[in-house]
């Protein structure tokens, strides 16, 4: 599906979807607990991949309104073929969990996931006793077979998902573990994992980049209410800043690193108010200026920041974002190509971009390149002109109903 977004003012209230990061982890923790309910999860293509994987390892799942009821497994003894579609989080965490099973499994995904390397995670799990067969750097498909045992292990973590995988798996492994993490990116996503583990009664002690994980623990999640997603909220905040006024509800504090979007927008001169007690964020049209942004912990915000940078006066430099080159696509190159298509000057760097903004109108054709965050972000620039986004259906990966939400705020959206 292609989408055209046309110039117009937006105004109104909206509630962003539930957090994708929290939903993944809550589903997995629930599937490892005797009896748990996950309330108000995000149901999207990626989280459905996790839900299906939870069922494949033996969890029973029942939907009841906006609650998902789980009867979980006592230990992982799964085998067979696992297709995780486009979900990197599902792939990485379940690679760790399947390392607990004495039986052989094959993990796979779609064309995009088959390009995402897992070498550092495979190396760490292999040192703990897992066996893998595949081609380095272990892009899917590859096979995994346990059983890992606790021990001392270290990992270079270009993806925080590798660390999350080890934290889940080692808490169930026989024997205590010490995990040393080097060159970590996106620490807040690890904090989200620790938050869910803590709610599940799983103990992890952290000291700097060292984690001590007692072995043979039991998951005891009872109920988890999934908070709103700040990554998804970032697009609506950006819409308010460039084209009117948006009030977002249900935006309470959490461990999500992407809550930093509020501070970044303010640094750019944006009028953004956040009432944390009421969980309300208000964003109004503002004159924006370029800034420098360290994206090491906020990779999913970079497309949003790039769109705001295109509007802002002056230059914006985004750095420490080299991990964007191994996301669903090479996001640095994808952002550069879409900015170029809209007449915005940008320079891709090894670890980010420099964007020269200040345009008041945007007309042209952009492409999602199969990446949901590209479609979510770049379609917004149509509010200041007319932008056609190719392959926009991928928004369903993290924000189903996105264009309906824009329409409810007054945007003109044409589906082709």
From Swiss-Prot:
The active site is at 300 (proton acceptor). It is found in: Cytoplasm. InterPro entries: Enolpyruvate_Tfrase_dom, Enolpyruvate_Tfrase_sf, EPSP_synthase, EPSP_synthase_CS, RNA3'P_cycl/enolpyr_Trfase_a/b. It catalyses: 3-phosphoshikimate + phosphoenolpyruvate = 5-O-(1-carboxyvinyl)-3-phosphoshikimate + phosphate. One of its GO terms (biological process) is chorismate biosynthetic process. GO terms for cellular component: cytoplasm. One of its GO terms (molecular function) is 3-phosphoshikimate 1-carboxyvinyltransferase activity. Pathway: Metabolic intermediate biosynthesis; chorismate biosynthesis. Its EC number is 2.5.1.19. Keywords: Amino-acid biosynthesis, Aromatic amino acid biosynthesis, Cytoplasm, Transferase. 3-phosphoshikimate binds at residues 20-21, 25, 159-161, 186, 300, 327. Belongs to the EPSP synthase family. Catalyzes the transfer of the enolpyruvyl moiety of phosphoenolpyruvate (PEP) to the 5-hydroxyl of shikimate-3-phosphate (S3P) to produce enolpyruvyl shikimate-3-phosphate and inorganic phosphate. Monomer. PANTHER family: AROM/DEHYDROQUINATE SYNTHASE, PENTAFUNCTIONAL AROM POLYPEPTIDE. This is 3-phosphoshikimate 1-carboxyvinyltransferase. It comes from Archaeoglobus fulgidus (strain ATCC 49558 / DSM 4304 / JCM 9628 / NBRC 100126 / VC-16). The gene is aroA.
């Amino acid at each position: 599906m292609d989408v055209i977004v046309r110039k117009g003012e937006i105004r109104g209230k909206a509630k962003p979807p539930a957090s994708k990061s929290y939903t993944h982890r809550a589903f997995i923790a629930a599937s490892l607990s005797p009896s748990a309910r996950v309330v108000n999860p995000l149901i999207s293509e990626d989280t459905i991949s996790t839900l299906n994987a939870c069922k494949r390892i033996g969890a029973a799942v029942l939907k009841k309104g906006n609650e998902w009821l789980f009867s979980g497994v006592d230990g992982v003894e799964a085998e067979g073929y696992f297709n995780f579609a486009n979900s990197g989080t599902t792939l990485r965490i379940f690679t760790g969990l399947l390392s607990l099973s004495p039986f052989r499994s094959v993990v796979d995904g779609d064309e995009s996931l088959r390009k995402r390397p897992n070498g550092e995670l495979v190396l760490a799990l292999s040192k703990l006793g897992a066996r893998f067969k595949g081609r380095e750097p272990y892009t899917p498909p590859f096979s995994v077979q346990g059983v890992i045992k606790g021990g001392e292990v270290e990992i270079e973590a270009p993806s925080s998902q590798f660390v999350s995988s080890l934290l889940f798996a080692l808490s169930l492994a026989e024997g205590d573990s010490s995990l040393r993490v080097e060159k970590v990116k996106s620490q807040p996503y690890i904090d989200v994992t620790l938050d869910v583990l803590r709610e599940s009664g799983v103990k992890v002690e952290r000291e700097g980049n060292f984690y001590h994980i007692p072995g043979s623990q039991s998951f005891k999640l009872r109920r988890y209410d999934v908070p709103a997603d700040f990554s998804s909220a970032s697009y609506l905040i950006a819409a308010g800043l460039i084209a009117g006024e948006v009030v977002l509800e249900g935006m309470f504090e959490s461990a999500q690193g992407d809550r930093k979007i509020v501070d970044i927008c303010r640094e750019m001169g944006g009028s953004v108010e956040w009432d944390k007690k009421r969980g309300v964020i208000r964003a109004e049209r503002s004159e924006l200026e370029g800034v420098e942004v360290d994206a090491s912990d906020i990779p999913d915000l970079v497309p949003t920041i790039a769109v705001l940078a295109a509007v802002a006066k002056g230059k914006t430099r985004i750095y420490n974002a080299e991990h964007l080159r191994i996301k669903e696509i090479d996001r640095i190159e994808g952002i550069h190509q879409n900015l170029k298509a809209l007449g915005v000057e940008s320079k891709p760097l090894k670890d980010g971009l420099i964007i020269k903004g200040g345009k008041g109108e945007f007309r042209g054709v952009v492409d999602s390149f199969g990446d949901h965050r590209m479609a979510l972000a770049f379609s917004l620039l149509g509010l200041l002109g007319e932008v056609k986004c190719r392959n926009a259906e991928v928004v369903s990966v993290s924000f189903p109903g996105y264009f309906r939400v824009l329409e409810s705020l007054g945007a003109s959206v044409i589906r082709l």
